[in-house]
Amino acid sequence: MRAVGVRGGAWLGGVNAWGDVFVDGQERLRWFVAADDRWYRPSRETTVRQREISGVPVVETRIKVPGGDAVQRVYGVADLGGAIVVEIYNDSTLPFAVAFDRGDIATMREPSPTGVQGIDLPAGSVVFPVGHHATMRAALLIGDRERNAGLNAGRKISAQQLESLPSFEQVERGWLAALHVTSRVDVPEASWSNILTTQRCKLLLTGGGGGDSGDRGDDFVALILDRAERVKLGDRPGEWVDEVARAAEQVLQRCAKRGSTSWLDERAILSAGMLLHRAGEVRGQQDVERAWSRLLGSRVAETASARADGEINSVGREAVEKYSGVRQIAWVESQLVAQRHDGVIEICPRGIDAGWRGANFECHRLVASTEHLISFAVRWHGEKPALLWEVEGPAGACVAASAIDREFFSSEMRGETLLAGFTVEQSALVK
């Protein structure tokens, strides 16, 4: 099931593998196509293909029909109190008809007076002709349903109102603009960028916040990562301060009891400090940093000149599929930047994979410390990578790329340099 909806909505839509539309887990609308040769039931067709356009909650489902495809696009809009728009596009050389299994939906024109013929559908089903390269639009009105059983069945909107709703291209651009405020990566491993897009859209679709703060340590980590991502996406940090501070305390206590830290613990503490900093909770931020420093033997407080002694907990090359949700975002970003225990910002802390040699790549606005963001690009000059970087935040940040060039170290907020190359042999990425 692929999710559709609006940012922070009180409802959540979904589209199953063949294009049936759901609202809050209940099936609301099915579609069927009458082509030149026969009726097509999407749930029984072997030619169904589906994708999320640009990775955002705009779901496109295609079915092969004579001369091309019948295309369904489903997405949520906030207009009219909330609606799920269903567009049927005839991407074929022949006309066809589309049927819906309910008639109490908003449509751009009246259904065919002949009704549905040649297929057994529920009473009240409606059918519409769709010409060559034409589009038929319908909508399920959500509105202020107050979680009742009906779906605004008695509410009607005009064809003009339906036509004025945003197109799928506009909704796609809106989602991408919402994501543009946080970190972005353009790297040879394309799935990493897709992960950031998909997981962040899932966050934006839910308004109450995920990350159950139960009794398990992983729940506290997930809560912190969830709230930090929401802040990076534009939420006000103040509303999350208390629960993030409590969750950070639980993570610290667990690490102390266990006598070790994991990379997820480090990302959680970094994220908690970032959120507290953005909320203006300087004392809380400093308390977390001091507690973390004590836990690590005060190595966080070491100066940059002692960078050779800095350490980063290894993520290794575990497949990202081992994780889910916000942990996947943390995994991707930790492959590209990390803060050492001595405070130095490490670019590509696990090195550059051998499979990336010769491929230029860049990353934007990655969280590098509680107070800093970093953007960087790698451009190849023969066998050597040139590094360009820019740090946002207060002066005093130090940058290194020890897994690529052990000699490189800079206290400049922006700059460029030609790195020596690989200091360790990198294996192929686990995808």
Residue ranges and their predicted role:
Residues 213-214, 249, 258-279, 298, ...:
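Carbohydrate-binding/catalytic loop surfaces
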Residues 146, 229-235, 256, 280, ...:
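Hydrophobic/aromatic-lined pockets within catalytic cores
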Residues 1-197, 201, 306-431:
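Terminal accessory carbohydrate-recognition/targeting modules of carbohydrate-active enzymes
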Residues 173-295:
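Substrate-binding groove/exosite segments of carbohydrate-active enzymes
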